[in-house]
Amino acid sequence: MNYMKTELQVPSDLRFLSIVENWLLSSLEVELGEHIDWPRQSNRLRLVLAEAYSNVIRHAHRDKPNLPVLVRLDVENRDIALEIWDHGNGYEMDTYNPPQPEAKQESGYGWLIMSRLMDRVDYKLQIDGRNCLKLEASLPEKA
């Protein structure tokens, strides 16, 4: 049984996105090795991580660039849980309305993208003064 837990704390700066992506994908490759279809899964995970991390920078920490972003990864066998912790005011998910295609709006697709690409998406407001976005998925074995 494979089990790993790791975390990374980075500044609220989009220039750190590639560092966070490399940390995530490298950690998963070290733990899961050749059993996963990396070209397909890395694109999926990169997109979800970019969406979640950039939302923290642009929204939660918009006026507070000195606050850190904490990213946690739990891996058990091929099940992954990725948590992104922020210090923002939070977002009431009850008020979220997915964008309608005919509306042609430019933003608001992040939650939709993340929930389509991951098996489970959960958001918790104000745990010890922080918010946590949890993204979970089972990575399929390489065919």
Predicted regions and their residues:
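Conserved beta-strand-loop-beta-strand hairpin that lines the nucleotide-binding pocket
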Residues: 1-8, 12, 57-143
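Acidic-residue sensor for enzyme active/binding pockets
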Residues: 21, 51, 83
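Hydrophobic alpha-helical segments, especially transmembrane helices
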Residues: 22, 45-47, 59
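Hydrophobic residues in the alpha-helical elements that line and stabilize the ATP-binding pocket
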Residues: 52, 56
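Short, structured helix-loop boundary elements
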Residues: 17, 38-42, 46, 66, ...
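Helix-loop-beta hinge of the Bergerat
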Residues: 3-39
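Conserved short strand/loop->alpha-helix "switch" segment adjacent to the catalytic nucleotide/phosphoryl-transfer site
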Residues: 28-50, 103-105
